[in-house]
Amino acid sequence: ELAKESGAKYLVDSHVDRVEGNEVILRNGSKHTAKIIVGAGGHNDPLRRDHWDESSLKIPVKFVLMEGDFGDAVELHFGSMAPGGYAWMFPKSSGANIGLGIQRSFSKGCSLNQYAEEFISKYDGEISFRGAGSLPMSGSIHTFVKGNYLLVGDAAGMVLPSNGAGITIAMVGGRIAGQVIAEHLSDGTPLAEYQHRWNKQMGKVMRNSKRAFRFGSLMFRLPNWMLNLTFNRLTKGIIWRAVTCRRMFWIL
C-alpha cells in the first residue's frame, strides 16, 4: 500500500518476455519503459538470463506445508537422507514446512521425488500445500549492476549457501538497492554504489557462508556414521559457526 501511495503500479498475472534497452517487454506484447530496471525474479530472472553470463549452482528442493502440532524445535538432517543438501522441518503456528534439497551429483541415481517422499512420510498430518523449486547455492554473484540494470534477491544469488537463508538477505539487498536508486535519481549517485554498500555490509557473512558450504560439501561425502559423529561429538562448535556464517577456523 505504501508503494501504491508513492505511485507504484502492480501488474498481476503479467510475465516478462525480455528486456531490451530501457524497455521491459511482456509476453502479451505490451512494453514498459524505465530509467532503471531491477531484476527480482528469482534465479530464473529474465533480466539475469539475458544480460548476465555468470552461472551458479542450483539445488532442487521439494517441500510441503503440513497441518498439525510439531512442537517448537527446528529439525535439520544431513547425510544420505538428503545427499549434498539437507532436509528440514520448520514448525509454524498451525503446522510445519517440511522438505529437502539435494545435489544431484551426490544422489546415486535416486530422484529428488524419492528422497522427498521418503522424508515427508515420516511425519503425520494433512498436507495443505506442495511446492518445488530450486535454491541458488553459489552465494552472491560478482556483479549486481550492469549499466541501468540491477539484480536483487535470488536473482543476484543472495542466498547463504551454508544454510539456505535468503529472505532476510534479500531484504537487505532490496533496501540497499532502493536507497542507491533513489540517490541516483536525486543527485546522481553511481548505481555501482549498490555493490559497494552490499559488500561492506554483507560481504564477510557471504564469504564465510561460501567457505562453510565448500567444507560441508566435503563432509557430505563421508559415511553416515562418520558424519553423525562429526556433527554430534567432535565439532559441534565448528558446525554451528558454519551454519551461522561465522569463521570456522582461523586458517579459513
What is the predicted role of each segment?
Residues 36, 70, 80-82, 94, ...:
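Solvent-exposed, flexible loop/coil residues
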